Amino acid sequence: MKQPFILTLVSSVACAVTAANKAPENTTPTKSKTPNVVFIYADDLGYGDLECYGAKNVQTPNVNRLAKSGILFTNAHATAATSTPSRYSMLTGEYAWRKEGTDVAAGNAGMIIRPEQYTMADMFKSVGYTTAAVGKWHLGLGDQTATQDWNAPLPCALGDLGFDYHYIMAATADRVPLSLIHI
C-alpha cells in the first residue's frame, strides 16, 4: 500500500517543481556566441609534455593560457602512431588502416584526402565557421604523386577540403620539397 502512495507523491512533487520552474513569458532569447576553436595537432607531443597537463620540466605559459579558457582533453587516443595516418583519421573520422595509401606520405605525395570526402573543416564550415590549417600538412597535395609544379597553383589543395585559409609545409622540414604554401 505504501509504494503506490509514494510513487504518486513523488510524481506530484516532480510535476509541481517542473511547473514552478517555467520560464517567464516575456523573456527574449539570448543569442549564443559561437566559441572559437583552436585545434593543436603536434607530432611527438606526449600527455606529460605541457605544463597544463602536469609537466614540470618545460614551461608552456601560452598553451596554459589557451587551456585555462578552453577545454582540456584528458582521455584521447591517437588512431595511429605516425603523422600521416593520424592526421588522416583526425580530419576525416576514418581509420587510416582501412584505406590504402594512408601510410607515411612522401614529400611529393598526391593528396590522400579526396575533395569528395567530408572533413572536419567541412563540418565546421557547415555551421558558419571560417577554417584554417597552419603548419605541417603531410597528407599530400595535388592530383598525383610526383607531378606537382611547386611554382604554380596546385590543382587539388586544402581549399578543396573545406579550408578557407592555409599556410602549410607540404610534408616535414626534413623531406623534399620543402615548400611553404600560402593561400
Predicted regions and their residues:
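Formylglycine-dependent sulfatase
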Residues: 2-8, 17-181
